[in-house]
Amino acid sequence: MKSPRAVRAPAGATVTDPALVRRAVKAAALGNAMEWFDFGVYSYIAVTLGKVFFPSGNPTAQLLSTFGAFAAAFLVRPLGGMVFGPLGDRVGRQKVLAVTMIMMAAGTFAIGLIPSYATIGVGAPLLLLAARLVQGFSTGGEYAGASTFIAEYAPDKRRGFFGSWLEFGTLAGYIGGAGLVTLMTALLSTDDLLSWGWRIPFLIAGPMGIIGLYLRMRLEETPAFAAEVEKAEANRPKVPLREMVAGQWKALLLCMALVLVFNVTDYMLLSYMPSYLTSELKYDETHGLLVVLGVMALMMIVQPFAGALTDRVGRRPVIAAGCAGFLFLSIPAVLLIRQGSLVAVALGMGALGLLLVCFTAAMPAALPALFPTRVRYGSLSIGFNVSVSLFGGTTPLVVTALIGATGNMMMPAYYMMAAAVVGGFAVWRMSESAGRPLPGSAPAVESH
């Protein structure tokens, strides 16, 4: 195991080289960007994939089938979290993050090789489902590992700022996926896009995976994990899964509630809305993707500043502001989007994007702080992935089904409002972690 270039201060604090912190944050964020490029591509090309893999005369049925395969990957995420999380607490964060990178890239690359339904029939959607399950299993260890890695490297007083770069990477990945799909949609004919063009973004995952693996293999283990190993003086005893769940049940419930509001709103805006604009509101596909692309670019600009704000005012006030905003502004925002004009759609989507920044900026620092070092990766993986699987990843499928059953185009707003209520209760119950050491770890400061 690689050891970090950090020293112990006389008072017991961990003093880490700022250059090493930036390197760790950059590598984790870049790897996360590559992971979420894959998910972003699937989301933004969902309408085309529905025609390739799920032939039907009903566009809503095609979209529902495509999002069904999308949601299926989230059903195995908790299993991936139960495997990779405890493993990361035992053998190290860096090794597990390298494995998740390989698996995610392989699953995405495989999608680009699958023949269409017209070529092999029912085998096509079955192979798509298999590839999505590989992606979902690997992603079960991704976010918790990356956020844990950054949180354990960052100094206590700047953990919010450094953690915000993880979601900066997520947005960059989404923009890469959305930008590529938008470019192909504009340049290729419908026939070319359906016959071969849709494969290009998935095949790009091959070389991207190699780059991501290189970045993660160069990472060094966190000072907090290294200190845990030193305490054991030998092989670390295996922490029972029961201890990660039953021993942390209060923190797990808080984690699941926070992840619920974070991911329902995240997947609603970044994954579902492009297809909502095209399939349900009959909005021009290219214009819809460009609006979402612009919203994500705006979020990227604001993201680091919002992360730094959480270090000054705390995580709780920022998350609470996001919950209040989604509770009271979701209906006006969706009404604006439904107006259909470019300005109205941009204003509605932009408002939702700025509210989402309250979560993307605060959560990477707030969630790891719920658990002690010994079980942080494992417990966070379990809580995060169970919540994402039940509520976040299923958002496009559930909202599409609700609209189909009721005919009510305001369902996205109602769904976000319900999530905001759950998130508000979690904020009320959680403790403030800004500027404080992570549970089970020594205070962390940055050398100058």
Residue ranges and their predicted role:
Residues R316-M363:
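C-terminal transmembrane helical hairpin of 12-TM major facilitator-type secondary transporters
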Residues A46-L79, L126:
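Extracellular/periplasmic helix-loop-helix junction of adjacent transmembrane segments
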Residues I102-I120, A324-Q339:
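C-terminal ends and interior cores of transmembrane alpha-helices
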Residues F161-T185, M208, G383-T395:
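Glycine-rich segments within core transmembrane alpha-helices of 12-TM secondary carriers
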Residues R90-I102, R312-C323:
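Cytoplasmic membrane-interface "Motif A"-like loop-to-helix N-cap segments
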Residues F67-P86, A105-G107, L293-A306:
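Central cavity-lining transmembrane alpha-helices of secondary-active solute carriers
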